[in-house]
């Protein structure tokens, strides 16, 4: 066996070695990484390897299977590995800081990787980890009634638990004052059409208000995201002092479980089917629907209780009901009524069924019962 094959075999054994963490990407957790940084000593996935290529002074990457590895490189990988390197570069990651997963957008992964290895924000044991606290700056915000993005000043007051934004730079009165209590932030780069697109939502007069913003700097928008998360965690600790931090962290911000177009009919089931954009919020157990993906407010929402409370989802439509253009149907059963939807493809239907069943099969948590009043579903169409 030549050096090439022998070293490849050693690397593949390292990938599977117990207690090393090498079987998942060191940066996003994706399973079975095929690349490695031979300068840092970590195994990473293809997507994260692309980010590492951008700073060769800090990290240099090779394919585990396709590139040539000499003995010294393999020895370096053997004496390092994912868990050992994480112990150094992730020694002091704040609880509020969002650690991206495999399916997260590129800007989150890129800034996480740069924060770890380039800026080394989480390494030195004697270095105090700074809390973002208050924050002020400009973001590009989409207009409520048009598609134009305009520059707006945002001010986060962490201690007061408020986010404000202003339509005029010198304006005294803010356009909106948003309580951190009801705020969520989630990256929606495809929907917004910008690689740094962030969706901020909050409750307003019984509805969910959507703000769509971005910043040209990836670092700036991720810093805003984590500052909002820090303020949210601070609020949760005050609101639920008896709960451990580990139970509060998953509640800081959340992503939609599933989004996409479906068609729906009205409560009498005789109304025409209309195309709507749907977003499933698993934490608040709401299926929200909009006329368009970037609308400021939802047209309506369906509260999703648990199977134990009589909530179900059926594959297909009730007998005698026919959709408009789309035939792959599903029916959400609540104690008050049936909500009937059709999906553009059978694949979409399967994904919606799986997502909805996942929410309905999970019991309402005590925290959810404290913070959310059960709603049966309402809407305009």
UniProtKB/Swiss-Prot annotation:
SUPFAM superfamilies: ArfGap/RecO-like zinc finger, PH domain-like
Protein name, per record: Arf-GAP with dual PH domain-containing protein 2
One function term, GO molecular function aspect: phosphatidylinositol-4,5-bisphosphate binding
Classification of source organism: Eukaryota, Metazoa, Chordata, Craniata, Vertebrata
Superkingdom of origin organism: Eukaryota
Keywords on record: Cell membrane, Cytoplasm, GTPase activation, Membrane, Metal-binding, Repeat, Zinc, Zinc-finger
Origin species: Mus musculus (Mouse)
Keyword Cell membrane set for record: yes
Main localization of the protein described in the UniProt heading: cytoplasm
Gene encoding the protein: Adap2
Stated role: GTPase-activating protein for the ADP ribosylation factor family (Potential). Binds phosphatidylinositol 3,4,5-trisphosphate (PtdInsP3) and inositol 1,3,4,5-tetrakisphosphate (InsP4). Possesses a stoichiometry of two binding sites for InsP4 with identical affinity.
GO biological process: heart development
Location in or out of the cell: Cytoplasm; Cell membrane
